[in-house]
From Swiss-Prot:
Keywords: Membrane, Mitochondrion, Peroxisome, Transmembrane, Transmembrane helix. This is Transmembrane protein 135. InterPro entries: Tmem135, TMEM135_N. It is a multi-pass membrane protein. One of its GO terms (cellular component) is lipid droplet. The chain crosses the membrane at residues 68-88, 96-116, 149-169, 298-318, 331-351, 380-400. One of its GO terms (biological process) is regulation of mitochondrial fission. Involved in mitochondrial metabolism by regulating the balance between mitochondrial fusion and fission. May act as a regulator of mitochondrial fission that promotes DNM1L-dependent fission through activation of DNM1L. May be involved in peroxisome organization. Pfam families: Tim17, TMEM135_C_rich. Belongs to the TMEM135 family. It comes from the Eukaryota. The keyword Transmembrane helix applies.
């Protein structure tokens, strides 16, 4: 607490906009760079989203450009206003405190910026930043020795999150919208208790398929014979009466689930690597082949495939053991399926899903009347979360997620890295740890402290 009251007498030029003594010109530099990068980010993003959603011509003519400009304005405002409040706070306080160059400047900037963005996007942005802020606070705690890291902690968190998600998925009206659709795509509609696919309908379809096969000429090719053999093996085998996978036995049901989601995971990772591979198509053609046999492709495939197969296998096993189908099975099956993250460890995925789970449970509590509703909660949470991340970006970059730090550098055209962090080292956060050899060249006419003098608290 004592560190919060300590201060240094340097001005905003000496600490923040070291490339330009003028606060106004520095603000314009940040604004121009942020606007340029924001348009580069949101223009293709909204265009691709519109194509995938099969928007009509009216959307492209009247709504696409305003939405791009609104989101770009939000991101630009977040970066530019941080620079503005950075200078304003220094002029008001007359000094820099531990909290003022990061948290203090980012809090009002983020609050004003999020009000510019469309309401439909605020919730998603809040979840992302809350997740990032939580991860940053955790790393700060670890760096200070307050928190002890848990081996495979991200896997354990994912197991707990998966258990709760799958339980809500199995419950009637437990999940809605995109989350429900995504889980139905991953684990299949057979695991939904309200699944309306009756055994009679299933067997009727099987008979129809058989009749169609019989109508075909006898000269069947090898592929058709193999397919017929596989179908025969899948249909004849152990399947509990409570299992709703009517066209498969329990074993083939799990195997098919693994193969399907392994393929999906493999293809997703391949697609993510396509842009970087094509950039080196002419200079390093061999890198194009690595697109298909990269280790991460198989890791993501193994993660998704094993998650589905473990979940389905455990669910079938519990139905056999207990001789009934129960929503509580999903808790055990989901927890065990979460172990699959050992193939593809990701703190980002675990934290994001956990944040979404908290949001889901919060809104369920509101619907049940057990939790109070807080107006503008998303705006406040976003502002505080972003301020925490900016505090880390200024005072202790080593605790910030590397991908977000790269994003901040891109948004500010690299100017976030030219802050005079050696001066900030006196606060004891290791501000210059990642910048040991950088010292800005300052014009002595605009400085308040001679750079050669030792820095002391005032």
């Amino acid at each position: 607490m004592a560190a919060l009251s300590k201060s240094i007498p340097h001005n905003c030029y000496e600490i923040g906009h070291t490339w330009q003594p003028s606060c106004w010109l520095s603000f314009l530099h940040i604004t121009r760079g942020a606007l340029e990068e924001s348009l580069k980010i949101y223009a293709p993003l909204y265009l691709i989203a519109a194509i995938l959603r099969k928007r009509k011509l009216d959307y492209y003519l009247h709504k696409l450009l305003p939405e791009i400009l609104q989101s770009a304005s939000f991101l630009t405002a977040n970066g530019a206003l941080f620079m503005a409040f950075f200078c304003i706070l220094r002029k008001i306080l007359g000094k820099f405190y531990l909290w003022s160059p990061g948290f203090g400047a980012a809090l009002p900037a983020s609050y004003v910026a999020i009000l510019v963005e469309r309401k439909s996007r605020r919730g998603l942005l809040t979840i992302y930043m809350a997740n990032l802020a939580t991860e940053t606070l955790f790393r700060m705690g670890v760096a200070r020795g307050v928190i002890t890291t848990l081996r495979n902690g991200e896997v354990l968190l994912f197991c707990i999150t998966a258990a709760m998600y799958m339980f809500f998925f199995r419950c009637k009206d437990g999940l809605k919208g995109f989350t429900f659709s995504a889980l139905r795509f991953i684990v299949g509609k057979e695991e939904i208790p309200t699944h309306s696919y009756s055994p009679e309908a299933a067997y009727a379809k099987v008979e129809q398929k058989t009749e169609k096969h019989e109508e075909k000429p006898r000269g069947m090719n090898i592929i058709a014979l193999v397919r017929k053999l596989v179908d025969s093996v899948c249909k004849h085998g152990p399947r509990h009466r409570c299992c709703k996978h009517y066209e498969d036995n329990c074993i083939s049901y799990c195997i098919k689930g693994f193969i399907r989601m392994f393929s999906v995971g493999y293809l997703i990772q391949c697609c993510l690597r396509i842009p970087s591979a094509f950039r080196h198509l002419f200079t390093q053609p061999s890198r194009l082949l690595s697109l298909f046999y990269n280790k991460e492709n198989f890791q993501l495939g193994a993660f998704l495939g094993s998650f589905v197969s473990i979940y389905k296998g455990t669910s079938c096993f519990l139905r056999w053991v207990r001789n009934l189908d129960d929503e509580l099975h999903a808790i055990i099956a989901g927890f065990l399926a979460g172990v699959s993250m050992m193939f593809y460890k990701s703190t980002t995925i675990s934290m994001y899903l956990a944040s979404k789970l908290v949001e889901t449970m919060y809104f369920k509590g509101i619907e049940a009347g057990k939790v109070p509703y807080f107006p503008h909660a998303d705006t406040i949470i976003y502002s505080i979360s972003t301020a925490i991340c900016f505090q880390a970006a200024v005072m202790e970059v080593q605790t910030l997620r590397p991908s977000y730090w790269k994003f901040l550098l891109r948004l500010t055209k690299g100017r976030f890295a030219v802050m005079n962090r050696k001066v900030l080292d006196v606060f004891g956060t290791g501000a210059s740890k990642n910048f040991p050899d950088f010292t800005p060249r300052l014009d002595p006419r605009y400085t308040t402290v001679t750079p050669e003098l030792p820095i002391e608290f005032s």
